């Protein structure tokens, strides 16, 4: 499984990397701009990500805008349904409006920080990633 971790906060980024590397090849970006660039490169190389763990509050471009941009790029390239990358939003913002907006924009799951690894495993199983 190819995984992109998008997290600006060092401790969270390191935690996610150490945990997720057991499930696949992980790339890490520290802001939304880098995330979009990494996603484009993965498509151009015909080696797309299977999963993106995407923080909402980040510098450059926030996670909601990254989510919207990725879904638009997929749509424009004819990537639909189960072929789309699975996106799990990871954030300390657990307000219902943020959760609803993320689902409206096309994320598959929403994980509040601090992350519970057992719940994350369960979500990945439900998404047929593991």
Question: Language-model features: where?
Answer:
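Helix N-cap/capping motif at the beta->alpha junctions
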Residues: 10, 28-41, 63
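Alpha4 helix (beta4-alpha4-beta5 surface) of REC/receiver domains from two-component response regulators
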Residues: 82-83, 94-109, 122
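Two-component/phosphorelay signaling modules centered on CheY-like receiver
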Residues: 10-28
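C-terminal output helix
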Residues: 115-124
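Short amphipathic alpha-helix used as the core "switch/output" element in two-component signaling
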Residues: 37, 64-82
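Receiver (REC) domain active-site loop signature in two-component systems and cognate sites
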Residues: 58
């Amino acid at each position: 499984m190819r995984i992109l971790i998008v997290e600006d906060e060092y401790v969270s980024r390191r935690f996610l990397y150490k945990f997720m590397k057991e499930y696949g090849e992980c790339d890490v970006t520290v802001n939304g701009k880098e995330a979009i660039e990494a996603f484009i490169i993965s498509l151009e190389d015909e080696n797309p990500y299977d999963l993106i763990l995407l923080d909402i509050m980040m510098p450059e471009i926030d996670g909601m805008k990254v989510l919207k941009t990725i879904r638009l790029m997929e749509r424009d390239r004819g990537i639909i349904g189960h072929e789309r990358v699975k996106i799990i939003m990871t954030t300390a913002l657990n307000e219902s409006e943020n959760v609803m907006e993320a689902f409206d924009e096309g994320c598959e799951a929403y994980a509040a920080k601090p992350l519970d690894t057992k719940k994350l495993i369960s979500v990945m199983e439900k998404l047929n990633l593991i």
